[in-house]
Swiss-Prot record:
Entry GO MF terms: NADH:ubiquinone reductase (non-electrogenic) activity; quinone binding
Entry's localization field: Cell membrane
Record GO biological process: ATP synthesis coupled electron transport
Protein name: NADH-quinone oxidoreductase subunit K
Underlying gene: nuoK
Keywords, ordered alphabetically: Cell membrane, Membrane, NAD, Quinone, Translocase, Transmembrane, Transmembrane helix, Transport
HAMAP family membership: NDH1_NuoK (MF_01456)
Spans through the membrane: 3-23, 28-48, 62-82
Organismal lineage: Bacteria, Bacillati, Actinomycetota, Actinomycetes, Mycobacteriales
Length: 99
């Protein structure tokens, strides 16, 4: 498969993720769309690394996955706290948190 096709797929995945972040109100769906955007960036990093014949993009993608794993832990904990206090995971309810 042509490497440019992977870049097109990466752009498509990133666009779908960005549209989901902007259009959806459910915090879990927004969270999944952010993860989709991170995976699209990882695909682009690995594709560029493959095209240029070095490992820098693959190493950067690995570190991005490590940061994304930490983001999952913190993000889901915050979503659970919002759900316990508001009984909803809507993004609109999250801006009302004070305590």
């Amino acid at each position: 498969m042509n490497p440019e096709n992977y870049l097109y797929l990466s752009v498509l995945l990133f666009t779908i993720g960005a549209a989901g972040v902007l259009l959806r109100r459910n915090a879990i769906v927004v969270f999944m769309c952010i993860e989709l955007m991170l995976n699209a960036a990882n695909l682009a990093f690995v594709t560029f690394a493959r095209m240029h014949g070095n490992l820098d993009g693959q190493i950067f993608a690995f570190f991005t996955m490590v940061v994304a794993a930490a983001e999952v832990v913190v993000g889901l904990a915050i979503i659970m706290i919002i759900f316990r206090s508001r009984r909803s995971v809507s993004v609109d309810d999250a801006d009302l948190l004070k305590y």
